[in-house]
Design a protein with these regions (language model features):
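Glycan-recognition and catalytic cores of secretory/periplasmic carbohydrate-active enzymes
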Residues: 1-269
């Protein structure tokens, strides 16, 4: 249990699932669980957990209101078994309670707890849906592959089709910020915003440089899960269309290929 971090004061796990995290870190923590369907698919406790975990994102658990079934969006980039984080995240939310850094090999090079906090100062924008949440489709996929229960496939289709529509409105490019009212980019239309989004280049406190930390490739998992359960190539086509859209903005500068910032006027149909 944590002392300072709200999400962990009653334990970092609840109902066998992380209370609140983003889907890069949820995904890293669930690598073994996501493979259990290949080895013990009939194990009762695995089946029960697969369905329970999926329910956290299907509006089935009132303690985990992560999903808006009307707007078909996950309400925050930080989510889990205790629901979404619906405020700006603090560095402490990301790092956790103070700890002794000595003895740990920090991948980003931090040597003090203060540097860990400084690393996450700019990671505050998390409210609203985010392409990183497409990784959450893995949970209903796990549940669907057990006995082909239609509701799991339908949720994947509904959620991913909503993202296809957002990409269509955004000239083929997947946005990294969808507001709680469903508006792409929020009131200002800044679709590239949010932590881990297209325009996310925070300062690394170890070297003082801005470093690109978008997590666009993780969204592919959602499209591959939708392709797996439906067989429809439109989910693969979305990725191809986006690559074409990005590459169409490429130009050569000093012998190197660069992509200019996209000026996208959202088409609301």
């Amino acid at each position: 249990k944590t002392t300072d971090v709200p999400a962990g004061r009653e334990g970092m796990y609840y109902k066998d699932f992380s209370t609140q995290s983003d889907w890069m870190h949820h995904g890293e923590g669930m690598q073994n669980f996501n493979r259990m369907g290949l080895s013990v698919p009939t194990l009762p406790i695995y089946q029960e957990r697969a369905r329970r975990f999926a329910g956290f994102y299907m509006a089935e658990d009132p303690e985990a209101p992560n999903y808006d079934p009307k707007l078909k969006l996950i309400r925050s980039m930080i989510n889990g078994s205790r629901g979404p984080l619906l405020r700006k995240a603090t560095a402490l939310d990301w790092v956790g309670d103070p700890f002794d850094v000595q003895g740990f090999g920090a991948l980003h090079g931090e040597s003090t707890f203060e540097q860990f906090l400084a690393h996450y100062v700019e990671y505050s924008d998390v409210v609203g849906d985010h392409f990183l949440n497409l990784v959450a489709t893995t949970l209903p996929t796990n549940a669907y592959l057990l006995k082909n229960e239609p509701k799991y496939k339908q949720w994947i289709v509904d959620y991913m089709d909503a993202w296809l529509e957002r990409m269509k409105q955004n000239k083929g490019i997947i946005p990294s910020h969808v507001a709680l009212d469903g508006k792409i980019g929020g009131a200002d239309g800044q679709w590239w915003k949010s932590a881990y989004g297209w325009g996310f280049s925070p300062v690394n406190p170890v070297n003082g440089r801005r470093e690109n930390r978008n997590r666009i490739p993780r969204a592919v998992i959602g499209f591959t899960n939708a392709l797996l359960v439906t067989g429809k190539q439109k989910y693969s086509d979305a990725g191809r269309t986006m690559i074409d859209s990005v590459n169409s903005r490429a130009r050569t500068v000093d012998g190197q290929t660069v992509v200019q910032e996209a000026e996208v006027e959202i088409d609301e149909g």
